[in-house]
A protein has these predicted regions:
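Feature 926 captures the class I aminoacyl-tRNA synthetase adenylation module centered on the KMSKS loop
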Residues: 201, 393-453, 457, 501-544, ...
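Active-site-adjacent bridging/hinge elements
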Residues: 34-42, 64, 100-102, 128-135, ...
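Short acidic-hydrophobic surface loop/beta-edge motif
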Residues: 200-207, 244-249, 343-347, 416, ...
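Structured ligand/cofactor/substrate-binding pocket environments in proteins
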Residues: 54-66, 73, 82-83, 151-154, ...
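Secondary-structure transition/capping motifs at alpha-helix termini
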Residues: 67-75, 96-109, 129, 133-138, ...
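N-terminal, positively charged nucleic-acid-binding surface of large information/translation enzymes
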Residues: 1-234, 258, 275-288, 292-307, ...
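Short Cys/His-rich metal-coordination motifs, predominantly Zn2+-binding knuckles/fingers
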Residues: 181, 251, 348, 419-421, ...
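Short, polar/flexible loop-turn hinges at active-site or ligand-entry regions and domain interfaces
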Residues: 99-114, 381-382, 536, 557-569, ...
Length: 877
């Protein structure tokens, strides 16, 4: 057995172990049809990304699952990769070029792409290297990139297939337009920021009448594109105006007054201006009423030639001028100060403009149906289940997906326009000529695809699709997807309908959803708040294992969690506790044969039974994806039952070389520690590997050792009950000593009084534990109080009373006060149980065993209360 260092130094251990794992290729997986497959595809981080706490949680959860399944004998594959992040990367490259005094247009498309690829090569792998610091055990031989050759082939294949089936089309719709970046952006890239603004209340005169319609808008500049005014059809105030026309001020243009149920009668005046080219809801109203669409802005956010004297002005400058004119001409009623959520581009922070644009779209109605069915048929499951409702809500209300982006970095749309006949040819490769008229005068679409288009293919493109690879046959559908609730729509849904459409199967069996990590005040981490925490700094100061343990034990599936430094300190302390306990075991260890069970003591059987139960409970929790609960159970077992109780219990046997049960104690210490380390390994891979390799030096690594499973031969329930009773007694003695301020050095005579023969037997044969753990000078077990002075303090445990004659050490007034508190506590418990059993609803619905448990509690608490009352009466005499 190798000697273990005195202290655990993560900075030394982690790099050495990770290098060993990489050299030995423990993470690498080949198709093995003799084993059950288990596959996870990593949520690919952006190549522009730096590791943040969200990445750390997301990938820790995946690593836990993959390490567990690997140890459990599965053919476990974790596919890593990175996303090309079209707009983020393009912005980074543009910024770098700007520092050199260059623009995209200066170098042209090819020159820009050369620079983008060079940037990717230099910076794209940083975050993957950072994930190694976290201990991630991905198959690094299989790293994928959403623009690598295989993924690009999958993208082209998918686009062409969908186009041929009529699911991809080109049309005019409202999209999110960023005037700063001059591209369409997805809803996922729009962040809503609370800003001070105004409601401008404006009168629109009715043609042929003195009446006016009063309405309010936050964007007066868009009124130049108004093509109607709408009211609710059931609004009696305006029914007489439906079908008439009104005048749009400033333009003095006549537009119809239409009736549409979109209008909220209760909001404002119940009248809204309709600008189909600049509002998604107005666009839908425009479709229903066949209204013209007038776009009033250029791509850079300036007003276009359709806006008369405002042409060329920035939209915000035009707003001021329009409001000024409205005021001068008497149409402006009032300006109301408000705070409202403004959609901004999350990358450049510019306010986005809803604008009508000719773009490429995916028709979603038919594609959504299989994605709905696979969930309804329970072939696809969400953990927690409530997120399935969100999934269904999105699918039932899905709109066509805008997939074109006005960017150069990304998958270029494989559509070729004929300058002679106008036909569009869609092909995986440049066709060279128009498929309709044969003209060679064709040009490829300048736009690229939304980043999510390639991400939607990730579960199968990473396994080799569109080719029928062995990996695709063996590992698809993948086992579980781990992701945050924030991208259920933007990523999860798109992967599901893509998998169903292209492969005919769901992309994964389960979706494990986690929440966000917030600071200790519940706020999101952000640069503006200055509350960000760098995981790499945490790893440098604490090690990866404490960070992983803190993240996972603080996490309940689907819920946000808060980051507390105190919890991180506790996790580091746990590492030290586990290290010191292991070192203690190794210092006392001797090689020997496995002892026969007859040589095992009650304490040995108790801890074996406990670790056996632990293996079963951890397996159950992991199978339900309750990773935090599983980790907490192992943590509690190691800290409390193994370190604080069992090790202390066996010390007298270890220190006595003549003790006939010493070998059994050593064997048990080692066996339980090995099993505990294995159970903790998925959560804390580095320290468990280091300790395991010192204890079990005949094995190469804990990673491929056998996962602990429940063994019937380690089931000692009677011994569990026995030692648990002793623990309860010792704990109560310690509590009394602490309450009475009895110094640890003072030895106390402990009396155990019980009429129960079985209880007396347990305590009679456990005296050494009281001497070791409760600082007892002597332990006397008897049937009654004979010989025990009336001034002794006591504690009631089940079927026994523990007495300690502390007359010279104890303030009896305090003892009476303590017993009064205990009495109140027990009275509350009795009252609670009695009321519960008197509740007819509970009795009618609860299972029989639950009712029996409550009745047993009632009996137990009443007996304990009677003993406390008796003791109080004696002390008050």
């Amino acid at each position: 057995m190798k000697e273990l260092a005195k202290n655990f130094d993560p900075s030394v251990v982690e790099e050495r172990l990770y290098n060993k794992w990489m050299e030995k290729k423990y993470f690498h997986t080949e198709v093995d049809k003799t084993k059950e497959p288990f596959c996870i595809v990593m949520r690919p981080p952006n190549i522009t990304g730096q590791l943040h706490m969200g990445h750390a949680l997301d990938n820790t959860m995946q690593d836990i699952l993959i390490r567990w399944k690997r140890m459990a004998g599965y053919n476990a594959l974790w596919v890593p990769g990175i996303d090309h992040a079209s707009i983020s990367t393009e912005l980074k490259v543009v910024q770098k070029m700007a520092s050199e005094g260059l623009t995209k247009e200066d170098v042209g498309r090819e020159g820009f792409l050369e620079r983008a690829w060079a940037w990717k090569e230099e910076y794209g792998g940083i975050i993957l290297n950072q994930l190694r610091k976290l201990g991630c055990s991905c198959d690094w031989d299989r790293v994928r990139f959403t623009m690598d050759e295989g993924c690009s082939e999958a993208v082209l294949e998918t686009f062409c297939r969908l186009y041929e089936k009529g699911y991809i089309y080109r049309g005019e719709k409202i999209i999110n337009w960023c005037p700063e970046c001059q591209t369409t952006i997805s809803d996922a890239e729009v962040e809503h920021v609370d800003m001070a603004g105004h409601f401008y209340h404006i009168n629109y005169p009715i043609v042929g009448s003195d009446e006016k319609l009063r309405l309010a808008t936050t964007r007066p500049e868009t009124m130049l594109g108004d093509t109607a005014v709408a009211v609710h059809p059931a609004d009696e105030r305006y029914q007489h105006l439906i079908g008439k026309t009104c005048i749009v001020p400033v333009l003095n243009k006549e537009v119809p007054i239409v009736a549409d149920e979109y209008v909220d009668r209760e909001f404002g005046t119940g009248v809204v201006k309709i600008t189909p080219a600049h509002d998604p809801n107005d666009f839908e109203v425009g479709l229903r009423h066949d209204l013209p669409r007038i776009c009033v802005m250029n791509d850079d956010g300036t007003m276009n030639e359709k806006t008369g004297r405002f042409a060329g002005m920035d939209r915000l400058e035009a707003r001021k001028e329009i409001v000024k004119q409205l005021d001068e001409e008497g149409y402006l009623v009032e300006i109301e100060d408000i705070t409202h959520a403004v959609g901004c581009h999350e990358r450049c922070h510019a306010p986005i403009e809803p604008m009508i644009k000719l773009q490429w779209f995916v028709k979603m109605d038919e594609l959504a149906k299989p994605a709905i069915k696979v969930y309804q048929d329970q072939e696809l499951k969400f953990v927690p289940e409530r997120f399935g409702k969100i999934y269904m809500h999105w699918l039932n209300n899905i709109r066509d997906w805008c997939i074109s982006r006005q960017l150069w970095w990304g998958h270029r749309i494989p559509a070729y326009y004929c300058a002679d006949c106008g036909h569009i040819t869609v092909a995986k490769e440049n066709p060279g000529k128009c498929e309709k008229c044969g003209s060679a005068n064709i040009t490829q679409d300048e736009d690229t695809l939304d980043t999510w288009f390639s991400s939607a293919l990730w579960p199968f493109s990473t396994l080799g699709w569109p080719h029928e690879t062995e990996e695709l046959k063996h590992f698809y559908p993948t086992s579980v997807l781990v992701t945050g609730y924030d991208i259920i729509f933007f990523w999860v849904i798109r992967m599901v309908f893509s998998g169903m459409e292209q492969i005919g199967e769901r992309p994964f069996n389960d979706v494990l959803i986690h929440g966000l990590i917030r600071d200790d005040q519940g706020r999101k981490f952000s640069k503006s708040l200055g509350n960000g925490i760098d995981p790499l700094e945490v790893i440098a100061n604490y090690g990866a294992d404490p960070l992983r343990l803190m993240l996972i034990t603080g996490n309940a599936p689907g819920n946000d969690m808060r980051f507390y430094w105190e919890r991180l300190d506790n996790c580091r302390n746990f590492c030290n506790k586990m290290w010191n306990a292991s070192r203690f075991v190794m210092m006392n260890m001797e090689d020997g044969e496995e002892p026969k069970f007859l040589m095992l003591t009650s304490a040995d059987k108790w801890i074996l039974s406990k670790v056996n139960t632990l293996a079963k409970e951890v397996q159950e929790s992991l199978s339900k994806y309750d990773l935090g609960l599983a980790a907490q159970k192992v943590y509690d077992f190691i800290w409390d039952e193994y370190c604080d109780w069992y090790i202390e219990m066996v010390k007298p046997r270890l220190y006595n070389k003549e003790d006939s049960t010493r070998a059994a104690a050593l064997w048990t210490l080692k066996q339980v520690l090995i099993n505990a380390l294995k159970l903790m390994h998925p959560f804390m891979p580095f320290i468990t590997e280091e300790l395991f390799m010192h204890i079990q030096d005949e094995e190469e690594t804990i990673m491929t050792s056998q996962w602990p499973v429940y063994k019937e031969e380690w089931n000692f329930k009677e011994n569990e009950a026995e030692i648990d009773a002793i623990k309860e007694a010792v704990r109560n003695i310690r509590n009394i000593r602490a309450e009475m301020n009895v110094a640890p050095s003072k030895k106390v005579h402990v009396y155990v009084v019980s009429e129960n023969e079985g209880v007396r037997y347990i305590f009679e044969h456990s005296k050494v534990f009281f001497k070791t753990l409760a600082h007892a000078s002597e332990v006397t077990v008897q049937t009654d109080k004979a010989g025990i002075g009336e001034d002794a303090v006591s504690v009631v445990v089940q079927d026994a009373i523990i007495y300690m004659p502390l007359a010279e050490l104890v303030d009896f007034a305090k003892e009476i006060e303590r017993l009064e508190k205990e009495k109140t506590k027990l009275e509350k418990e009795v009252d609670r149980v009695v009321k519960k059993l008197a509740n007819q609803g509970f009795v009618a619905k609860a299972p029989a065993h639950v009712i029996e448990e409550e009745k047993a509690k009632e009996e137990k608490y009443k007996a304990m209360l009677a003993q406390v009352e008796e003791r109080l009466a004696q002390l008050k005499k």
